[in-house]
A protein has these predicted regions:
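Short, hydrophobic alpha-helix immediately C-terminal to the catalytic nucleophile
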Residues: 49-53
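Gly/Ala-rich beta-loop-alpha elbow adjacent to hydrolase catalytic centers
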Residues: 39-48
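Active-site catalytic motif of lipid deacylating hydrolases and related acyltransferases
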Residues: 1-35, 172
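Short glycine-rich or small-residue beta-strand-to-loop segments that form or flank ligand, phosphate
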Residues: 37-40, 69-70
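Surface cap/lid and interfacial helix-loop subdomains adjacent to catalytic sites
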Residues: 20-32, 54-171
Length: 172
């Protein structure tokens, strides 16, 4: 991984600098003071955490416009304190972050066991460890935004259950 050697760390830093510069450019030329939703996946989750630590948390005028932040697809080790930018606790929360890294039900990566990693169940939008059973899964919207069934219903409802457990999202 990028954390195992100096060239990997350099590559990560170069990528992060591109992201920070692109975000600043967006704010200056395109945002026009509008609200912001941030989303990151996998390695991007690490970049977004760094953007929070090094830029966003130091800029209240920008931070207050961030409605939600999705730190998905990798462990979101808390890069900030709850007072700075909290983990969302229910579906109506704003100005907070959501995070999950999903695995097959029961699987725990050996290097992440017994850690305190923030996690949100994306079916219920709650992080209290309660399971979302198949009947609460509304369905899937495909990336082309097409509905298979008539009436704009989501496809394949009640197909997934999930539970947060020790920093993981277990899915079945």
């Amino acid at each position: 991984g990028y954390s195992d050697n100096s060239n990997g760390i350099k590559a990560f830093d170069i990528a992060y600098n591109d992201i920070e510069n692109a975000f600043k450019y967006y704010l200056k030329y395109f945002n026009n003071g509008n609200r912001i939703v941030l989303a990151a996946h996998s390695q991007g989750t690490h970049h977004l955490q760094k953007l929070f630590k090094e830029y966003l948390l130091k800029n209240d005028s920008i931070l207050k416009r961030i409605e939600l932040s999705y730190l998905v697809g990798d462990r979101a080790i808390k890069a900030f304190t709850v007072e700075d930018y909290p983990l969302c606790e229910n579906p109506t929360d704003l100005h907070c972050f959501l995070s999950w890294n999903s695995y097959k039900n029961g699987f725990s990566p050996y290097n992440l066991r017994n850690t305190n990693i923030p996690v949100t169940n994306p079916i219920t939008w709650i992080n209290n460890g309660d399971a979302s059973w198949y009947n609460s899964h509304g369905g899937i919207l495909f990336s082309n935004y097409k509905f298979i069934k008539k009436g704009n219903q989501l496809n394949y409802p009640k197909m997934v259950s999930a539970i947060t457990h020790s920093g993981f999202l277990w899915v079945s």
